[in-house]
Amino acid sequence: MQDAVTEPKEGMYPFFDRSEDVKYLPTFLFDKEAIIYPGEGTEFMPRYIKGKFALHQRCYAIFDFKDTVTAQFLYFYLKTQNFYFVRNAVGSTVPSLRLDTFQKLKVIIPPKIMQHKVSLCLSSMEQKCNAEKAILQLLLKQKQYLLRQMFI
């Protein structure tokens, strides 16, 4: 496998591994709507993607969703289930998830119209939070620059 890079470039595809940071590769393995889970770690937070991506061997991808549940609704639902995955992870050194952990999870599935409403609302809130985080990072960089200029 090629070395992953941390900054996206033209012709690069998201590469998901166990870390919180998304890396990028020049090749992809999947072109799907999917929910990605790290297979090892201390927190098991899902990621949502629609499009081309690559996946580390210690990650799970949930895709090919049935007509009863939308991918985005399931993604937001699974974001509330970290306690379940942490509690059911196995291993003494590095907690790991197994396939049966996913298979045993009980999922509450409301009617499709409600799934769309919930997903739309939560998606817009998530986009707003991500935009605010990006602004915060820029402001922190600006602060560091100004502090360096003050003490030269």
Please state what every model-predicted region is.
Residues 1-109:
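DNA target-recognition domains and sequence-specific DNA-contacting regions of bacterial/archaeal
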Residues 106-152:
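Amphipathic alpha-helical coiled-coil/heptad-repeat segments
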